[in-house]
Curated annotation (Swiss-Prot):
One of its GO terms (molecular function) is structural constituent of ribosome. The lineage of its organism: Bacteria, Bacillati, Cyanobacteriota, Cyanophyceae, Synechococcales. Keywords: Ribonucleoprotein, Ribosomal protein. Transmembrane segments: none annotated. This is Large ribosomal subunit protein bL17. GO terms for cellular component: cytosolic large ribosomal subunit.
Length: 116
């Protein structure tokens, strides 16, 4: 029995789910906003906030953890440079989820997740 799931399973095996979240996190940090389904946006929020918290910490160990998760090494360096000045006074809540219209093909609930 799996009690208290921390992230939704998103109807994918573990390796595909991790790759999906890594890709979405990389895209969110690069672009600043991502349009995806509501369930994926909620799962992405945890990962993105974890990466920004690592960037605020700024230690070598946290930088290495971020490089191991985010696909683009240059993106990690730019995140670590900008995170303290952008989110220095904020203790969490670095992202915002805004619901949008449902997807036309399958009527899935869509959302825009963006960095605050």
């Amino acid at each position: 029995m799996r009690h208290q799931l921390r992230i939704p399973l998103l109807s994918k095996p573990a390796d595909q789910r991790k790759a999906l979240l890594r890709g979405l996190t990389t895209q969110l940090i690069r672009e600043g906003r991502v349009t995806t389904t509501k369930a994926r946006a909620k799962a992405l929020r945890n990962e993105a906030e974890r990466m920004i918290s690592l960037a605020k910490e700024g230690s070598l160990a946290s930088r290495r953890r971020a490089i191991g998760y985010i696909y683009d090494k240059k993106l990690v360096h730019s995140l670590f440079e900008k995170a303290k000045e952008r989110y220095g006074d904020r203790e969490g809540g670095y992202t915002r989820i805004v619901r949008t219209v449902s997807r036309k093909g399958d009527n899935a609930q869509m959302a825009i997740i963006e960095l605050v």
